[in-house]
């Protein structure tokens, strides 16, 4: 799947889940389960509750995503 097919949304981390998963509330009100992208893990960037994050999602499954940016 190419990067062009990925959907990108902004949201806020609502809850920290086991196995490095996060519950993120998107700006449009939807709640998704997301994991940290490889670059975030490699550079040891911490994602905490209340952080504003950028989430990438595939159009095929809009309940799961990948956190690509924290800021």
Curated annotation (Swiss-Prot):
Subcellular localization(s) per the UniProt record: Cytoplasm
Tree of life domain: Bacteria
GO cellular component, one term: cytosol
SUPFAM superfamilies: Nucleic acid-binding proteins
Gene3D superfamilies membership: Nucleic acid-binding proteins
Keyword Iron listed: no
Alphabetical list of InterPro entries matching this protein: NA-bd_OB-fold, RNA-binding_domain_S1_IF1, TIF_IF1
GO terms, molecular function: ribosome binding; rRNA binding; translation initiation factor activity
Domain (S1-like): residue spans on this chain: 1-71
Keyword Transferase carried by entry: no
Keyword annotations: Cytoplasm, Initiation factor, Protein biosynthesis, RNA-binding, rRNA-binding
Main location: cytoplasm
Pfam families attached to this UniProt entry: eIF-1a
Listed HAMAP family: IF_1
Function: One of the essential components for the initiation of protein synthesis. Stabilizes the binding of IF-2 and IF-3 on the 30S subunit to which N-formylmethionyl-tRNA(fMet) subsequently binds. Helps modulate mRNA selection, yielding the 30S pre-initiation complex (PIC). Upon addition of the 50S ribosomal subunit IF-1, IF-2 and IF-3 are released leaving the mature 70S translation initiation complex.
Subunit record text: Component of the 30S ribosomal translation pre-initiation complex which assembles on the 30S ribosome in the order IF-2 and IF-3, IF-1 and N-formylmethionyl-tRNA(fMet); mRNA recruitment can occur at any time during PIC assembly.
Homology family: Belongs to the IF-1 family.
Protein name (record): Translation initiation factor IF-1
Organism: Pelagibacter ubique (strain HTCC1062)
Gene coding for it: infA
């Amino acid at each position: 799947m190419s990067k062009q097919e990925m959907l990108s949304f902004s949201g806020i981390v609502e809850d920290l889940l086991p196995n490095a998963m996060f519950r993120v509330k998107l700006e449009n009100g939807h709640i998704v389960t997301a994991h940290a992208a490889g670059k975030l893990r490699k550079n040891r960037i911490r994602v905490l509750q209340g952080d504003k994050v950028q989430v990438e999602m595939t159009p095929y499954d809009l309940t799961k995503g990948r956190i690509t940016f924290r800021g």
